[in-house]
């Protein structure tokens, strides 16, 4: 049965707007933070938001706070809209790396915060509630043994966090209830924290992506392609964006008939066009051929129009992301794939990328071998058994085939999987990243995510499970994580071709789960419009673009006209240690890598300034030499002695 994709409950109780802070979110903390991964916006904020007002506390906590001055040192820094919901003292965090540490555990409507003053510097654990997958009780009131009674939170970002409570303290029940309430607000008919967060940034990230400007950058519309508003009210396809690019000679009435033959109405529409050959990447869902092998003249004519728009090739390639056996099995459900008999001059290629359930299981296996500890003696065989890198290889290899066919073959391609919102998004966005240097800039990459993932209906709400306690939901899958992993693999092979750094990619993934920003909420453009996210929430790009120096690759050189061909073989791929194993302190660099990036950027700027000064000096000397050469000189007549 099809699961409802509504996200109307995400902001069910919008908070009244608070006076926003205009201070930049800069870190002032020097405490040890073994498990903190938030961007500075999620960890430390301006003094305005670290208010000592009792307004930030539930009434039953005010007495506790006023009676214990030490609590002020143990409380978390609060974001605008954030308030404390519960606090438990004398809780022990069972750290899998450094051992048990005792401190104060605080639950707000945004985060789980643990701080111990027993260590110098203080030990801090800071995790957004959005990252929590499930909360489990450990032991009963009669449990014996040290630290055998408490809570364990299983997280979406690989971690498990375990806290021991004293049975006589009666704090476990209260913390558990508040975690279940605020970590899963959608299940409790409460708003996600993104609807409470009211920070103001210099740039509005919601305005970053303008589809008309992006298509104009690509040279659209032209004589072969037009922009249609047939989906302006999302009536043609409720998971597609309002503006679509389609063949110029196909009228809107025919688009409706094509939509009836494609799964969920997701017709082939243009994602990218080659600036020289006019070869295109179009994306769609599977055709509804069924076991009887149904055909659609309108769909066949439509694909012919796509092929005809490229004068340099008389064929078209259809890349089906699925394994062929899965595509055949989909016929029993009414779906299927394009028959080469029905579609003239079309070649069908299966890319053998597995479905969301296989990927979810692969990530589960990966978590088992990387957290908390790594078994060195069987590391390679254990990693191989997860098949994670094998899946990454197949996705990269598929995108590479698409990019090569467009660039070298000058041939238009059509990409789809079953519904066209998971594997299809991975393939089109990665191929476009290889082909177009614009998408390798920081803002260009943000546009790519907005365009190929958000506007074209990747189901972020269902795949991530924002605020939903149903952790066993079969719709959850690490599809977007795999895409970012593939991007990281490309940055390793082409370290100077990307304007952004690893910290940028990790920040995006952290806020995929955090629910601090509205960027990754809901399942479609239509739903985000209904929820009025641009007005009611802050965009992740607002935060990132306010401090680009943190996310800039110091080695970046402009490769805008270069096509990247990454090597998609197991020998050239590696596990992303900086993301999957970052919680292990033995795997961390002594200094945060983004600090090193800043130093390198400053050094590069200093050297560039010296180069410019030397160039000016050389230019001035050349000018002076030219002036002297052109000025009249005193003539000396040689004296000759004639013998």
Curated annotation (Swiss-Prot):
EC number: 3.1.3.95
Ranges for region Disordered: 1-56, 615-643
Domain called GRAM: residue spans: 68-139
Gene Ontology molecular-function annotations: phosphatidylinositol-3,5-bisphosphate 3-phosphatase activity; phosphatidylinositol-3-phosphate phosphatase activity
Subcellular location(s) per record: Cytoplasm; Early endosome membrane; Cytoplasm, Perinuclear region; Cell projection, Axon
Residue numbers binding a 1,2-diacyl-sn-glycero-3-phospho-(1D-myo-inositol-3-phosphate): 330, 355-356, 418-423, 463
Keywords linked to the UniProt accession: Cell projection, Coiled coil, Cytoplasm, Endosome, Hydrolase, Lipid metabolism, Membrane, Phosphoprotein
Chief location of this protein within or outside the cell: cytoplasm
Active site: 417 (phosphocysteine intermediate)
One GO CC annotation: cytosol
PTM comment: Phosphorylation at Ser-58 decreases MTMR2 localization to endocytic vesicular structures.
Domain spans labelled Myotubularin phosphatase: 205-580
Biased composition (Polar residues): 1-12, 23-40, 632-643
Modified sites of kind Phosphoserine: 6, 9, 58
Catalytic reactions on record: a 1,2-diacyl-sn-glycero-3-phospho-(1D-myo-inositol-3,5-bisphosphate) + H2O = a 1,2-diacyl-sn-glycero-3-phospho-(1D-myo-inositol-5-phosphate) + phosphate; a 1,2-diacyl-sn-glycero-3-phospho-(1D-myo-inositol-3-phosphate) + H2O = a 1,2-diacyl-sn-glycero-3-phospho-(1D-myo-inositol) + phosphate; 1,2-dioctanoyl-sn-glycero-3-phospho-(1-D-myo-inositol-3-phosphate) + H2O = 1,2-dioctanoyl-sn-glycero-3-phospho-(1D-myo-inositol) + phosphate; 1,2-dioctanoyl-sn-glycero-3-phospho-(1D-myo-inositol-3,5-bisphosphate) + H2O = 1,2-dioctanoyl-sn-glycero-3-phospho-(1D-myo-inositol-5-phosphate) + phosphate
Bias type Low complexity, positions: 41-55, 620-631
Coiled coil: 593-627
Membrane topology per record: Peripheral membrane protein
An example Gene Ontology biological process: phosphatidylinositol biosynthetic process
SUPFAM superfamilies recorded: (Phosphotyrosine protein) phosphatases II, PH domain-like
Subunit (UniProt): Homodimer (via coiled-coil domain). Heterotetramer consisting of one MTMR2 dimer and one SBF2/MTMR13 dimer; specifically in peripheral nerves stabilizes SBF2/MTMR13 at the membranes and increases MTMR2 catalytic activity towards phosphatidylinositol 3,5-bisphosphate and to a lesser extent towards phosphatidylinositol 3-phosphate. Heterodimer with SBF1/MTMR5; acts as an adapter for the phosphatase MTMR2 to regulate MTMR2 catalytic activity and subcellular location. Heterodimer with MTMR12.
Role, per record: Regulates the level of these phosphoinositides critical for various biological processes including autophagy initiation and autophagosome maturation.
Free-text domain note: The coiled-coil domain mediates homodimerization. Also mediates interaction with SBF1/MTMR5. By mediating MTMR2 homodimerization, indirectly involved in SBF2/MTMR13 and MTMR2 heterotetramerization.
Family designation: Belongs to the protein-tyrosine phosphatase family. Non-receptor class myotubularin subfamily.
Official protein name in the record: Phosphatidylinositol-3,5-bisphosphate 3-phosphatase MTMR2
Organism: Pongo abelii (Sumatran orangutan)
């Amino acid at each position: 049965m099809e699961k409802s994709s509504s996200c109307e409950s995400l902001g069910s109780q919008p908070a009244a707007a608070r006076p926003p802070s205009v201070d930049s979110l800069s870190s002032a903390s020097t405490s040890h933070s073994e498990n903190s991964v938030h961007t500075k916006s999620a960890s430390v904020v301006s003094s305005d938001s670290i208010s000592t007002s009792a307004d930030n506390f539930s009434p039953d906590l005010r007495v506790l706070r006023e009676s214990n001055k030490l609590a002020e040192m143990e409380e978390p820094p609060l974001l605008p809209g954030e308030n404390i919901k519960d606090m438990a003292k004398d809780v022990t965090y069972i750290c899998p790396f450094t051992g048990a540490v005792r401190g104060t555990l605080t639950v707000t409507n945004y985060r789980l915060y643990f701080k111990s003053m027993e260590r110098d510097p203080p030990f801090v654990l800071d995790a957004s509630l959005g990252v929590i997958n499930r909360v489990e009780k450990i032991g009963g009131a009669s449990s014996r043994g040290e630290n055998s009674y408490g809570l364990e939170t299983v997280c979406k970002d690989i971690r498990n966090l375990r806290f021991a409570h004293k049975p006589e303290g009666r704090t476990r029940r209260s913390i558990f209830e508040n975690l279940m309430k605020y970590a899963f607000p959608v299940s409790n008919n409460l708003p996600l924290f993104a609807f409470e967060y009211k920070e103001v940034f210099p740039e509005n990230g919601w305005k970053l992506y303008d589809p008309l400007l992006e298509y104009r950058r690509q040279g659209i519309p032209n004589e072969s392609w037009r922009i249609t508003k047939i989906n302006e009210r999302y009536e043609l396809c409720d998971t597609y964006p309002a503006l679509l690019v389609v063949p110029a000679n196909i009228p809107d009435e025919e688009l409706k008939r094509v939509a009836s033959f494609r799964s969920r109405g997701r017709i082939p529409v243009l994602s990218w066009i080659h600036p020289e050959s006019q070869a295109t990447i179009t994306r769609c869902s599977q055709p509804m051929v069924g076991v009887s092998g149904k055909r659609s003249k309108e769909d066949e004519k439509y694909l012919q129009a796509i092929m005809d728009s490229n004068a340099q090739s008389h064929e078209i390639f259809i890349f089906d992301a699925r394994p062929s056996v899965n595509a055949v099995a989909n016929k029993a459900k009414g779906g299927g794939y394009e028959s080469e008999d029905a579609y003239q001059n079309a070649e069908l290629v299966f890319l053998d990328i597995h479905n969301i359930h296989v990927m979810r299981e692969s990530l589960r296996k990966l978590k088992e071998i990387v957290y908390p500890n790594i078994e060195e003696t069987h590391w390679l065989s254990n990693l191989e058994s997860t098949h994670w890198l094998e899946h990454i290889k197949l996705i990269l290899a598929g995108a590479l085939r698409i990019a090569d066919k467009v660039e070298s073959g000058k041939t238009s391609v059509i990409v789809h999987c079953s519904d066209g919102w998971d594997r299809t998004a991975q393939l089109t966005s990665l191929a476009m990243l290889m082909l177009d240097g614009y998408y390798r800039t920081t803002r260009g990459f943000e546009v790519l995510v907005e365009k190929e993932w958000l506007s074209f209906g990747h189901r972020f709400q269902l795949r991530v499970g924002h605020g939903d306690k149903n952790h066993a939901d079969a719709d959850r899958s690490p599809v977007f994580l795999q895409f970012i992993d593939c991007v990281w693999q490309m940055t390793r092979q082409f370290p100077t071709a990307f304007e952004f750094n690893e910290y940028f990619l990790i920040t995006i993934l952290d806020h995929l789960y955090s629910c601090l920003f509205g960027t990754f909420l809901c399942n479609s453009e239509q739903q985000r419009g209904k929820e009025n996210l641009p007005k009611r929430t802050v965009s992740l790009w607002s935060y990132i673009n306010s401090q680009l120096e943190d996310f800039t690759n110091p080695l970046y050189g402009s490769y805008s006209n270069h096509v990247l061909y990454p090597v998609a073989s197991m020998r050239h791929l590696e596990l992303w240690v900086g993301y999957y194993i970052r919680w292990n302190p033995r795997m961390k660099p002594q200094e945060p890598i983004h600090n090193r990036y800043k130093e390198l950027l400053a050094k590069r700027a200093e050297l560039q300034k010296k180069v410019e000064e030397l160039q000016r000096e050389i230019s001035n000397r050349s000018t002076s030499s030219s002036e002297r050469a052109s000025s009249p000189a005193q003539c000396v007549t040689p004296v000759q002695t004639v013998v």
